[in-house]
């Protein structure tokens, strides 16, 4: 059994990879020796639109080849309206290898980019063109947004099982992030244990290229590691983990049987990596990056307590008279030396004021 290791709570826990091998009499373990950054390959000719491989023998080879982690919480249901809302960027992946075809999941996050796992892209053995993507696939005969061929792979430099895949445009010169709206990423400022989440992807124990959603709660969260109590199977690798706002908070990688399923949590390190490599990635509440200390008043970062009067932060109730906040209209104001009604004004020659000195 091929094992991968992820540091969790200062312990190393053996984890099973979750790519599914289909239509193959034998399978080699997924290689971890692929280059971290495959060079971009120029597309000289229009590539034919990829098609989903199908047939009666399209099924997982062996359960040992995938993390088949069904937990007591097995709340899974099929998504048939795959082009609706946050489901649209969820993507079915096939990796064509000499030993067969691996199936997995991913999520579109930019004009021409998708997120999935390192162990999925490792199956390309250095040839990005071996990876095909079908956003919003409904089944093996119906993928409304067509297929796309990868052209470049960038693997996360940290421990997390995360990779960015860049795609060539299709025959109509459309990019994958133009035929579907890319997913919104969470800044994860409020993400915590016990929150409701969903993992949405293409599990290998269901009909080929059908989208399924699994519901559960976060059970552990530290650094780049996130664990949850919901069920997944092989093929779910690379699935987005959504919060209740339908924002992506992590990328599912697999699990440990009878214990948990897990994802790469998008913490600050991961977020910085994504921003550096995906120019148009969209993080929620990231519209005013230069004013992080005053999110409620983005146009007045220097005066967070008085957004309605940026020119007079010390006197929000009297924006027109910052020098006399207490009584601008008072004619008897003792601090006004030129006030003819001021009895303390020694320069006052007003005959109507008998108390004047």
From Swiss-Prot:
- What processing steps or modifications follow its translation? Proteolytically cleaved by aureolysin (aur). This cleavage leads to the activation of SspA.
Question: GO molecular function terms here?
Answer: serine-type endopeptidase activity
Q: Where is this region: 18 X 3 AA repeats of P-[DN]-N?
A: 289-345
Question: What keyword terms does UniProt attach to this protein?
Answer: Hydrolase, Protease, Repeat, Secreted, Serine protease, Signal, Virulence, Zymogen
Top EC class for this record: hydrolase
Specify whether Secreted is a keyword of the entry: yes
Per the UniProt entry, the disulfide pairs are none
Q: Which GO terms describe its cellular component?
A: extracellular region
| Residue ranges of the propeptide | 30-68
- Give the signal peptide as a residue range, or say none if absent: 1-29
A Pfam family (short name) is: Trypsin_2
InterPro entries from the UniProt entry? Glutamyl_endopeptidase, Peptidase_S1_PA, Peptidase_S1_PA_chymotrypsin, Peptidase_S1B, Peptidase_S1B_tx, V8_his_AS, V8_ser_AS
Q: Where in the cell is it found?
A: Secreted
Please give the catalytic activity noted in the UniProt record. Preferential cleavage: Glu-|-Xaa, Asp-|-Xaa
Q: What is its main location?
A: secreted
Q: Where are the sequence repeats?
A: 289-291, 292-294, 295-297, 298-300, 301-303, 304-306, 307-309, 310-312, 313-315, 316-318, 319-321, 322-324, 325-327, 328-330, 331-333, 337-339, 340-342, 343-345
Instruction: State any further remark.
Output: The cascade of activation of extracellular proteases proceeds from the metalloprotease aureolysin (aur), through SspA to SspB.
Q: What is the official name of this protein in its record?
A: Glutamyl endopeptidase
The protein's gene is named sspA
């Amino acid at each position: 059994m091929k094992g991968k290791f992820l540091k969790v709570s200062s312990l190393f826990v053996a984890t099973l990879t979750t790519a599914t091998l289909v239509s193959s009499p034998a399978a080699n373990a997924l290689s971890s020796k692929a280059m971290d950054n495959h060079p971009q390959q120029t597309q000289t000719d229009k590539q034919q639109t990829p098609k989903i491989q199908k047939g009666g023998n399209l099924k997982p080879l062996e359960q040992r080849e995938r993390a088949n982690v069904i937990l007591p919480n097995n709340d899974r249901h099929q998504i048939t309206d795959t082009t609706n809302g946050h489901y649209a960027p969820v993507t079915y992946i096939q990796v064509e290898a000499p030993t067969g075809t691996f199936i997995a999941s991913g999520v579109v996050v930019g004009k021409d980019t998708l997120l999935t796992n390192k162990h999925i892209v490792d199956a390309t053995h250095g040839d990005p063109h071996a990876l095909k993507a079908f956003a919003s696939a409904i089944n093996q005969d119906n993928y409304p947004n067509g297929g796309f061929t990868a052209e470049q792979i960038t693997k996360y430099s940290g421990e997390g099982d995360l990779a960015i895949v860049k795609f060539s445009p299709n025959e109509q010169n459309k990019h994958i992030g133009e035929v579907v709206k890319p997913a919104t990423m969470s800044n994860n400022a409020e993400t915590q244990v016990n929150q409701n989440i969903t993992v949405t992807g293409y599990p290998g124990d269901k009909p080929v290229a059908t989208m399924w959603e699994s519901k559960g709660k976060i059970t552990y969260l530290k650094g780049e590691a996130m664990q949850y109590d919901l069920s997944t199977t092989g093929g779910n690798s690379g699935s987005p983990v959504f919060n209740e706002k339908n924002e992506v908070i992590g990328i599912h990688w697999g699990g440990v049987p009878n214990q948990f399923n897990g994802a790469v949590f998008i913490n600050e390190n991961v977020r910085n990596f994504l921003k550096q490599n995906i120019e148009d990635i969209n993080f929620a509440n990231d519209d005013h990056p230069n004013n992080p200390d005053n999110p409620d008043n983005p146009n007045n970062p220097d005066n967070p307590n008085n957004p309605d009067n940026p020119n007079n932060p010390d006197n929000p109730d009297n924006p027109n008279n910052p020098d006399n906040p207490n009584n601008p209209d008072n004619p008897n104001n003792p601090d006004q030396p030129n006030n003819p009604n001021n009895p303390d004004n020694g320069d006052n020659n007003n005959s109507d004021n008998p108390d004047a000195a």
